[in-house]
């Protein structure tokens, strides 16, 4: 899919395994004769003591490594041992009514924002057609939605004035963001149905997307904008080429 539209643009050591290496003290006397039982028991006990002492020393070293105390330049730095990975909590989707109005035929229309990512690829393709974006394979559209960190939508929901009428739901806007889930996010594919433009819905959609990312502790937010919408994004707080940083692109040359 087309971009939103230039960018307001850081050893686990495990104890060794031990094995017995045959030596003169392992129990065989000169010329292969077996030692006396008492000597055998004595040697066996001594061997066990030495093995226990060796294991104790190595285990002690392992424990000291695991405790995370590393001495360097006469200072002590505490290094916590790696903990079990914590599963990331799935953010709860948000849904709210941005606008409600009564139409000429008496029906009621609501414009609903949602961050649940509920998008029908055929509806999205139809919306892209309305704004003049080139068509992309539906499988790739579906993959882009599935792999996005956040997919926000605007739907028009029309409720008839008569009880027997059917509710109509139409996709009129969308924006999505990809992210490393920690520091950075990039906003893509911001679009609003032309018949709903000029009503502040695009601004409301973007403000909700930005707020949602900030609530998830992601504050480095970028996007790509063509010349026609640069001022729109500047009014939302985006800055072009901040501190001389340039967005760079690589395209295949074949």
UniProtKB/Swiss-Prot annotation:
Question: Where does the entry say this protein is expressed, by tissue?
Answer: Expressed in roots and shoots.
PROSITE patterns recorded for this chain? GNAT
Question: Which compartments does it reside in?
Answer: Plastid, Chloroplast; Nucleus
Q: Where is the N-acetyltransferase domain?
A: 111-254
User: Which reactions appear under catalytic activity for this entry?
Assistant: serotonin + acetyl-CoA = N-acetylserotonin + CoA + H(+); tyramine + acetyl-CoA = N-acetyltyramine + CoA + H(+); tryptamine + acetyl-CoA = N-acetyltryptamine + CoA + H(+); 5-methoxytryptamine + acetyl-CoA = melatonin + CoA + H(+)
CDD domains, alphabetized: NAT_SF (cd04301)
Q: Which InterPro entries match?
A: Acyl_CoA_acyltransferase, GNAT_dom, NSI-like
What is one Pfam family matched by this protein?
A: Acetyltransf_1
Per UniProt, which keywords does this protein have? Answer: Acyltransferase, Chloroplast, Melatonin biosynthesis, Nucleus, Plastid, Transferase, Transit peptide
What is the transit peptide's residue range?
Answer: 1-74
Q: What does this protein do?
A: Catalyzes the N-acetylation of serotonin into N-acetylserotonin, the penultimate step in the synthesis of melatonin. Catalyzes in vitro the N-acetylation of tryptamine to produce N-acetyltryptamine, 5-methoxytryptamine to produce melatonin and tyramine to produce N-acetyltyramine.
Q: What is this protein called?
A: Serotonin N-acetyltransferase 1, chloroplastic
- The species this protein belongs to is Oryza sativa subsp. japonica (Rice)
């Amino acid at each position: 899919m087309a971009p939103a539209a230039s960018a307001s643009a850081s050893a686990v050591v495990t104890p060794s395994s031990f094995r017995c290496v045959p030596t003169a003290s392992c129990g065989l006397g000169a010329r292969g004769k077996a030692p006396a039982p008492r000597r055998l028991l004595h040697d066996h006990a001594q061997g066990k003591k030495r093995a226990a002492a060796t294991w104790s020393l190595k285990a002690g070293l392992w424990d000291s490594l695991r405790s995370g105390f590393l001495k360097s330049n006469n200072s002590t730095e505490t290094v916590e041992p790696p903990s079990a990975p914590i599963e990331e909590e799935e953010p709860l989707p948000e849904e709210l009514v941005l606008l409600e109005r009564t139409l000429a035929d008496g029906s009621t229309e609501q414009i609903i924002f949602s961050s649940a990512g509920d998008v029908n690829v055929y509806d999205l393709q139809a919306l892209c057609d309305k704004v003049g974006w080139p068509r992309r394979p539906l499988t790739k559209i579906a993959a882009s939605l599935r792999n996005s960190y956040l997919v926000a939508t605007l739907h028009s929901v029309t409720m008839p004035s008569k009880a027997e009428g059917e509710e109509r739901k139409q996709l009129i806007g969308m924006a999505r963001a990809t992210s490393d889930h920690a520091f950075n996010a990039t906003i893509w594919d911001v679009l609003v149905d032309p018949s709903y433009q000029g009503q502040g819905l695009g601004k409301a959609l973007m403000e909700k997307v930005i707020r949602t990312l900030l609530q998830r502790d992601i504050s480095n937010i970028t996007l790509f904008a063509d010349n026609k919408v640069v001022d729109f994004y500047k009014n939302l707080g985006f800055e072009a080429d901040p501190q001389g940083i340039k967005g760079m692109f690589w395209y295949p040359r074949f």
